[in-house]
Every structure is written in structure tokens, then in C-alpha cells.
């Protein structure tokens, strides 16, 4: 019986197609076979997909300080700033030249009088019309120069009861002389005269009637006799008075 079974199995094995070693039909499991030889390296596979972004790493340590860069280009000009506070006053500067020219002028007239004037002496014109600088003395009748320069003096006299001769006098010397004859007519006559003269500080000018009968200067409420003078131009810059 046993030999018949063996023959039957061999016949089946010979008539069957080859089978994969791993698929040999077996009624009973056999022992594990020997390990096979390693296979050949396969071809390179396709690139895989990008992986997910990783998490942010921890902050790194501060780096070393770098070198300073080159200066940049000048920026645009800014808007004007607010006005600053006033500074302290500076020192006083040197004195400048006089911007207002010096002045000197006067005018006076005689009061009404029946008494003849003194001869060969200064003739007072006691009623002051203008004397802002105070250079004329109404008591003595003398003008005293304070501003050096060229002056003009004038006398306008009413002549009555006698002929009149008078002089413009500078420091005791006559600089101009004038005369008017009176012929006894009932109405007064007139006599005018003037002169221009250069004066220095403290020079004096006055009017002086002549000696003798030529003293017919007159004044009343309706007619006057006047003495006037004024500075034409000054050379004060060369005088110690204005130094």
C-alpha cells in the first residue's frame, strides 16, 4: 500500500508545472529554507515632497558691534526756528558827530524912552524878542559868541529929534558904521545897517551910538528900533567848545 502511494505522488509531481518555492503546495508545513542571496540595488526613486516647515529657533546671541559707516549726504535745510530772546545791551559806542547843527540867534528892541541914549558906550536893547540860547544880554546890550562861525548882525533904527550915527562893534572895534541926517521934519526917519562877521568863542558884538549930537535913535508904541543877529554857519568841529 505504501509503495503505491509513493508512486502516485511522484506521478503528480512530474505532470505538474513548476511552482514558486514560496507557493509549493504542501499538506504539511516544511522546515524554513536557507536564506537567499542579496538582491541587486534598485534604481533611484522619485524625489519626495517637501516636509513641513520647522518651528522658529531660539534667538541667537547678540553679534559684535560693527564698524561705523561713512557720513551720509547733508539733508535738506530745515524750517526757520523761533526767534530767540533779545541779548544783553552792548557797551556804549564812541561819541559820533553832532547830527543837529548848533544854533545861535537873538532879536531885541528898545523900550520907549525920552532920555537920550548914552554915547560912546554899548546901547542896550532891553525888550527881548528871541533869545533861546541865551547868548544875548539884554542888560548890557552885548552878544557873546558861544558857537564859532560866521554871523550876520542887523540894526533897524527909527531916527527922530536928531541925526543918528551908530556902529556895529566887535570887542571894542567898529566893524561897520551907519549915518542918517535928521532935517527937523515932523515925522521920524529910519536907518538900517548890517554886517557879516566871523566870531570865536567869547567874542562880543554890540551897537554903539556916535559921540556928540548924533544920538537920535527913537522908539515908541508905533515905531521900534531893533538889534538882531544869527549864526550863518558854524565851524564848531575845530573849536574846543564842541570837542
UniProtKB/Swiss-Prot annotation:
Residues 15-125 are annotated as: Disordered. Residues 99-238 form the C1q domain. Its main location: secreted. InterPro entries: C1q_dom, Collagen, Collagen/C1q_domain, Tumour_necrosis_fac-like_dom. Disulfide bonds: none annotated. Residues 1-15 form the signal peptide. GO terms for molecular function: identical protein binding. It is found in: Secreted. GO terms for biological process: inner ear development; protein secretion. It comes from the Eukaryota. Residues 83-96 have a biased composition (Low complexity). Keywords: Collagen, Disease variant, Secreted, Signal. Residues 30-95 form the Collagen-like domain. SUPFAM superfamilies: TNF-like. GO terms for cellular component: apical plasma membrane; bicellular tight junction; cell projection; collagen trimer; extracellular space; lateral plasma membrane; plasma membrane; transport vesicle. It is linked to Late-onset retinal degeneration: Autosomal dominant disorder characterized by onset in the fifth to sixth decade with night blindness and punctate yellow-white deposits in the retinal fundus, progressing to severe central and peripheral degeneration, with choroidal neovascularization and chorioretinal atrophy. This protein is produced by a bicistronic gene which also produces the MFRP protein from a non-overlapping reading frame. May interact with ERFE. Homotrimer (via collagen-like domain). May form higher order oligomers by supercoiling of the trimers. This is Complement C1q tumor necrosis factor-related protein 5. It comes from Homo sapiens. The lineage of its organism: Eukaryota, Metazoa, Chordata, Craniata, Vertebrata.
Amino acid at each position: 500500500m505504501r509503495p503505491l502511494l509513493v508512486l502516485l505522488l511522484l506521478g503528480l509531481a512530474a505532470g505538474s508545472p513548476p511552482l514558486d518555492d514560496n507557493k509549493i503546495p504542501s499538506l504539511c508545513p516544511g522546515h524554513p529554507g536557507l536564506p537567499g542571496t542579496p538582491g541587486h540595488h534598485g534604481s533611484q526613486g522619485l524625489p519626495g515632497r517637501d516636509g513641513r516647515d520647522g518651528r522658529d529657533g531660539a534667538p541667537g546671541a547678540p553679534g559684535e558691534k560693527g564698524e561705523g559707516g561713512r557720513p551720509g549726504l547733508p539733508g535738506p535745510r530745515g524750517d526757520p526756528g523761533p526767534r530767540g530772546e533779545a541779548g544783553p545791551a552792548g557797551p556804549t559806542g564812541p561819541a559820533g558827530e553832532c547830527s543837529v547843527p548848533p544854533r545861535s540867534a537873538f532879536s531885541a528892541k528898545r523900550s520907549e524912552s525920552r532920555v537920550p541914549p548914552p554915547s560912546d558906550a554899548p546901547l542896550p536893547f532891553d525888550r527881548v524878542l528871541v533869545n533861546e540860547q541865551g547868548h544875548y544880554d539884554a542888560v548890557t546890550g552885548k552878544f557873546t559868541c558861544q558857537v564859532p562861525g560866521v554871523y550876520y548882525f542887523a540894526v533897524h533904527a527909527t531916527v527922530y529929534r536928531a541925526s543918528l550915527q551908530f556902529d556895529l562893534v566887535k570887542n571894542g572895534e567898529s566893524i561897520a558904521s551907519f549915518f542918517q541926517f535928521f532935517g527937523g521934519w515932523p515925522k521920524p526917519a529910519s536907518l538900517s545897517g548890517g554886517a557879516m562877521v566871523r566870531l570865536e568863542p567869547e567874542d562880543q558884538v554890540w551897537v554903539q551910538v556916535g559921540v556928540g549930537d548924533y544920538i537920535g535913535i527913537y522908539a515908541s508904541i508905533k515905531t521900534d528900533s531893533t538889534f538882531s543877529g544869527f549864526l550863518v554857519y558854524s565851524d564848531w568841529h575845530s573849536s574846543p567848545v564842541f570837542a
